[in-house]
């Protein structure tokens, strides 16, 4: 198995575990997730911490876990494209609250950095795979 594919799959697994952990923490109302800010109601697509947590668990937890399993087990070339798509989705989900509410929060900035890294890993891996295929075709000619 390609070393880059292992690293990208490991990063996706780490993000999946983080999404499951944060989603569970939010659902259990642990930490800072007590009352949903009233100024967010009507401006954000979610109106409670629970709906936000379930969205994060399903989309980012299950999505990244599925991509990680694909990368570790199936050894497929689609891992990089799916990783880039999940990175773009995390990037968009991180920027959206700043646009809708008009303020940046520390977790949003951290998620933005994580999303940019995931997007970059996916794009780099995909470009590398494309370059390998181009070189193989050139050798055959």
Feature map (PLM): residue ranges:
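Topology signature of small-to-medium multi-pass alpha-helical membrane proteins
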Residues: 2-141
């Amino acid at each position: 198995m390609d070393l880059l594919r292992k690293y990208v799959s490991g990063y996706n697994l780490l993000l999946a575990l983080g999404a499951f952990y944060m989603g569970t923490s939010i659902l259990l109302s642990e930490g800072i997730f007590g009352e949903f800010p009233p100024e967010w109601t009507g401006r954000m697509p979610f109106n409670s911490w629970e709906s936000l947590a379930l969205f994060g668990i399903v989309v980012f937890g299950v999505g990244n876990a599925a991509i990680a399993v694909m990368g570790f087990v199936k050894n497929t070339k689609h891992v990089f494209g799916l990783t880039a798509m999940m990175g773009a989705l995390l990037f968009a989900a991180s920027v959206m609250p700043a646009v809708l509410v008009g303020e940046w929060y520390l977790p949003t900035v951290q998620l933005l950095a994580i999303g940019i890294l995931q997007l970059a890993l996916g794009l780099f891996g995909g470009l590398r795979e494309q370059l390998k295929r181009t070189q193989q075709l050139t050798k055959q000619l």
